[in-house]
Amino acid sequence: MTSVTLRNVCKSYGDVKISKNVDLDINSGEFVVFVGPSGCGKSTLLRCIAGLEDITSGDLYMGDKRMNDVEPSKRGVGMVFQSYALYPHLNLFDNMSFGLKLAKADKNEIKKRVDHAADILQLGHLLERQPKALSGGQRQRVAIGRTLVSQPDVFLLDEPLSNLDAALRVQMRIEIAKLHKKLGCTMIYVTHDQVEAMTMAEKIVVLDGGYVSQVGAPLELYHYPKNRFVAGFIGSPKMNFVSVFIEEVEKSQVKVQFKNGASFWIPVDGSNVKRGERMSLGIRPEHLVPAENGDAVIDGDILVVEKLGYETQIYLTIEDGDADMIYRVPDTALVKAGERFSVGIPAHRCHLFHNDGKACQRLYKEAGV
């Protein structure tokens, strides 16, 4: 196990900057997830840590040692790629031991390591089979096992579940989380799927356009996003945004007004808010309430109703919304597309964003954060 530290790390291809001034502290034994939309630089950053890409500027440390000029094979990292890259003509044992054999490791040590990894990954009974005889989930476990036998200080996983179907993704999420708990090693995991990030990570790094947008525990990012990008990216369905007028401002609360005239106080830091300006109010679909229970009410026309059994997702078109508003109702709601519908907004669950995207600090204390 070892810590990973990045100081002002930049990566460019010619004049195109991919990773921009990245500062990160990853503790020894921590499970960290890099998440963000396609093209945000998360895989590039992972490859820089692995040594597969040169760092243009800045410093990378593992423990106390600067690693910028250290060869990938000597960094003590193991990488699991999106593609399994298994040798089709070799059985599982030979696939998992291939790197050790190239390194001319002792035969007894090779068998010991492969058997141990196979036991952890529940592959012991499959070691004589070839990859074509395995399911997608089993192949991914073999790819992880091939990295595991090298006994790296840091595991790097680059979207390892993206080739699996939905059911297998859930299963493998659990398997990887169990593996981390059992090994206690440092893991850095890349995904574009914020559900994977929320369910697996101890710490999430949200990347946007090459910059680190926010770093924190999953619930911290969910309840207290520092900007509108993080607020909209973390959570599924994503946060609703509504344009509001600032009516009054106090130190620990701000009074906002909708276009329909409804106004109410939101418990946020008002130190940088100006009376009379327009801002963006955010509210998560699952935090909306029946109209009679809200501090304010918004009316809209139902566009689509998605009945999932355990919940109903109601898509509304409203005058004030930056997009369609989504309301998640527990259980089944007996409503139809085309109907007029009202939803309640609880003040304590609201977020408030400046025009540059920065969030006002929420003052309501959420459970678990």
Swiss-Prot record:
It holds the Pfam family TOBE_2. Signal peptide: none annotated. Its EC number is 7.5.2.1. SMART domains: AAA (SM00382). It is found in: Cell inner membrane. SUPFAM superfamilies: MOP-like, P-loop containing nucleoside triphosphate hydrolases. Its main location: membrane. The keyword Disulfide bond does not apply. This is Maltose/maltodextrin import ATP-binding protein MalK. The lineage of its organism: Bacteria, Pseudomonadati, Pseudomonadota, Gammaproteobacteria, Vibrionales.
